[in-house]
A protein has these predicted regions:
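Glycosyltransferases and closely related glycan-assembly transferases
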Residues: 10-23
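Short, well-ordered turn and helix-capping elements at secondary-structure junctions
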Residues: 27-29, 104
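Short catalytic-loop micro-motif centered on adjacent basic/acidic residues
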Residues: 1-2, 24-26
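Conserved phosphate/ATP/ADP-binding segment of small-molecule kinases
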Residues: 20-22, 30-99
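Conserved phosphate-binding/catalytic loop of the ribokinase/pfkB sugar-kinase fold
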Residues: 1-11, 34
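Conserved phosphate-binding/catalytic region of the ribokinase-like
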Residues: 65-183
Length: 183
């Protein structure tokens, strides 16, 4: 997982990896504006890029998220996640699309860090899988959304610090029943 860091540092980290199985990267507007050439080089070398709606549009000059995802895939990564804040995220893989909603909450205390929690939960879930299938990525997206739902309930990482697998799995089951989809 190449976190939202200076693209030069991301490239240094990437170059230190020996035969990585699956590389995920995150970025932000500042790096897109100021380090575009280096950023494009990194994008071409990863398996999945995770961006929010604004970043996807900025990288591709397209208003359509589907078109943005296709353009990002053409840059190198076969998989794209576009985070949509309170509206969840969309996973694009080859010609498949999976939209995962945000977990419905009555109260949101602070959304700061929810996107980072989402991609961290996604990466953690995916790392436990024996295969990197679309089904595994769908499950990882649901896990990421469930983890992000805890992040927004408190300031900072307080809610995550007390999160257990039992609580997380309970939320995933509740999520599944609320949205009525198979994972």
């Amino acid at each position: 997982m190449l976190g939202n860091l200076d693209p030069n540092l991301q490239l240094d980290v990437l170059n230190q990896m020996k035969n990585p199985k699956f590389v995920i990267m995150d970025t932000m507007n500042f790096w897109i504006e100021g380090y575009r050439t280096k950023l494009d080089e990194i994008i071409s070398k990863v398996d999945l890029i995770s961006v929010n709606e604004e970043e996807a549009r900025q990288l591709t000059n397209s208003l359509s998220l589907i078109d943005s995802a296709k353009k990002l895939q053409a840059m190198g990564p076969k998989n794209v996640i576009i985070k949509k804040g309170e509206h969840g995220a969309i996973l694009f893989s080859d010609k498949k699309i999976f939209q995962v909603p945000a977990f419905p909450l009555k109260k949101i205390f602070d959304p700061t860090g929810a996107g980072d929690s989402f991609i961290g939960g996604f990466a953690g879930s995916l790392s436990e899988k024996k295969q990197l299938s679309f089904q595994a990525m769908k499950t990882a997206a649901v896990t990421g959304s469930a983890i992000a739902s805890y992040t927004v309930q408190q300031f900072g990482t307080k809610e995550l610090e007390n999160l257990t697998f039992r609580k997380l799995n309970k939320r995933i089951k509740e999520f599944k029943s609320l949205t009525n989809f198979e994972i």
